[in-house]
């Protein structure tokens, strides 16, 4: 995990830079064929989109090559400035931030951004795996689930997706363990 920390820090910083972009148009990747097939199952899938707005040149320069793979976006220094001022960067988000779903429905999280994200169910919202982003966002207590990530929990950009099933009636919380202000609350219904 220690060797992944610099890479994750880079990814986080790149994502923050993109969120602060002034770009008027964003090119979004198309969902994968598997995502389309799952979404076509009538009423069985609730879609959550993962957004960011990283500028590839400034994020890749600050964090490392390949951190940001989209075109245009927010410069890294602006991302850090906005995160420092507000504790979050609006372009880095899950949409919707809250939704209702039936027990047994599938939540399909699709990465429409240019950075790697996670879609991690947590008991309580908290910090993630990038200490600098935790500090700047005010999420200094790390969510334990973020410390137990597996390699396949990291969702690359380009329309890639992850699925999770609504297992019970009640509230389920999901966050990105790289950008911990990216969150959604799911209200499980019978």
Question: Residues of each region from the PLM?
Answer:
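Sec-dependent bacterial lipoprotein signal peptides
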Residues: 1-18
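Extracytoplasmic copper-binding redox domains, predominantly the cupredoxin/blue-copper superfamily
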Residues: 20-190
């Amino acid at each position: 995990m220690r060797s992944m920390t610099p890479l994750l820090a880079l990814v986080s910083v790149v994502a923050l830079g993109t969120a602060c972009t002034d770009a008027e148009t964003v090119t979004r990747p198309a969902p994968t064929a598997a995502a389309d097939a799952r979404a076509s199952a009538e009423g069985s899938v609730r879609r959550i989109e993962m957004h960011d707005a990283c500028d590839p040149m400034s994020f890749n320069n600050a964090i490392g090559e390949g951190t940001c793979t989209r075109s245009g976006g927010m410069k890294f220094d602006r991302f850090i400035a906005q995160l420092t001022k507000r504790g979050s960067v609006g372009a880095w988000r899950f949409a919707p931030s809250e939704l209702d779903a039936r027990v047994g429905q599938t939540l399909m999280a699709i990465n429409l951004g240019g950075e790697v994200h996670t879609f991690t169910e947590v008991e309580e919202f908290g910090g993630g795996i990038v200490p600098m982003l935790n500090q700047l966002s005010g999420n200094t207590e790390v969510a334990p689930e973020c410390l137990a990530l597996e390699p396949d929990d990291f969702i690359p950009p380009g329309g890639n997706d992850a699925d999770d099933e609504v297992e019970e009636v009640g509230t389920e919380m999901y966050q990105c363990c790289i950008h911990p202000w990216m969150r959604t609350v799911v209200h499980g219904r019978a």
